[in-house]
Amino acid sequence: MDLSDLVQLYSDGIPQPTITPPTQNKDELNKNNNNKNKIIRHKGGNKNNRNNKNNVDNNNNNNNNNNNNEKQNQTNVNNEKITNTETLEIKKNNNNNNNNNNNNNNNNNNNNNNKNKYNKFNDNNNKKNKRNNDDDDDKEEMKRIKLFNQRLKEIKIQESPEDIARYLEERRRRYPSKANIEAKKKEEEDARKRGELLYNNNNNSKKKQTPDKKKKLENQTSKNNNKSSTTKTELTNTTTNTSSTTNPTTDTTTTTTNVVSIQKENENQEKENNDNDNDNEPIEVPSTLEFNKFEEKPIKEVKVNTASSNKRNKKRNNPKKVKEEPQVNKFQDSLFTKLFERDISAENNIILQCFRHFANKINQINGNDKLDEKKEI
C-alpha cells in the first residue's frame, strides 16, 4: 500500500454531517433521492472497486511479504547454516592450524633430534675414521715390513752358495779372536812407524777443531814471557851479588861469564833433544878474555813514577769489562769433509809419509857428513 491510497481511504470513510435540505415537493425529493442514491451507488461501486483493488493489492503485497519472509527465513536458515558451517569451519581451521603447528613443532623437534644424532654420528664417524686411518697406517707399515721380509727372503734364496761361503770367510776374518787382535795391533804399529795417522771409527773420540787453540797459544806466550822475566830477575840478582863481593873490574867479567854459560847450557840442551847422535861431542866454552874485549853495556835502572796521576792508576787497576761475545765454532766439519773423510785421511797419511822420508834422508846426509869430518880429524 502506498501513502496516497491510505489518504483516500481515510478521506472517504469520514462521516459527513447530515444537512437538512429545504422542504420541497415529494416528486422533487424522490428525484433528488434517486439521483443521490445513484451517485452514492456509483461512488460506492467505485469505492468497492477501489477497495477490492486495494485488497487485491494488499493480498499481493501480503503474498509478496510472505514470499519475502519465506525468503528471509530461508536466508536466515541459510545464514544460520552458513554461520554454523563457518563456525565449524573456523573450529576445524583452528584445530587444523593447531594440529599443523603441533606437527610443525614435532617436525622441528624431530629435525633437531636428527641433527643432533647426525652430529653425534659424524663425531663418531670422525673418531672411527681417525682410528681407521691410524689402523690403515699401521696396516700399511705391516705390509711394508712383510714386503721387505719377502724381498730379503727372495734375496737370500737367490744367493749362490759361493756368495754364502765368501760371506762366512769375511766374518771369520773379522771375528775378534786373539790372532786377529794381535795382527791388527801389528798393522797399527807398522802404520805408526810409517807415519800414518790412525783414525778410529768412533766419532766421539775424534777431537774437533775449535778456535780454543788461539787461547792455548796466548797462554803459552804469557808463560814464556813470565819465564823470560824470571830469568832476567835471576840474572840481575847474580850481578848484584857479585858486585857486592868483588871489585867493579871483576864484576863485569863474572856477569858476562855467567850469562854466556847459561845461554850455552840452553843451546846444548836443545841440541841434545834434536840430535841424539852428537851427545859425545865436546862443548867449546870461550875464554873470559875474549869477552872482555867487548864494550860493557850499562844496565838501565827503571825509575818508578810515584807522582803519577790517580786517573791513570784507576784506569790501569779498573779496566773496562769487555763484553764476551758468544763463541762460534769457526772450524765446523763441512758436508764435504764428512763424506770424503776416508779419502782425506788417506791423502794426509801419504803426505806425512813423504815428509818423513825427506826428513830421514836429510838426517842420513847430515850424519854421513859428520862421520866424514870425524874421520878427517
Curated annotation (Swiss-Prot):
It holds the Pfam family NUFIP1. Residues 182-196, 209-218, 265-274, 292-303 have a biased composition (Basic and acidic residues). Residues 10-79, 91-141, 182-257, 265-284, 289-326 are annotated as: Disordered. InterPro entries: NUFIP1-like, NUFIP1_cons_dom. It comes from the Eukaryota. Residues 14-24, 46-79, 93-124, 221-257 have a biased composition (Low complexity). Coiled coil: none annotated. GO terms for cellular component: nucleus. Residues 311-320 have a biased composition (Basic residues). GO terms for biological process: box C/D snoRNP assembly. One of its GO terms (molecular function) is RNA binding. This is Putative uncharacterized protein DDB_G0274405. It comes from Dictyostelium discoideum (Social amoeba).
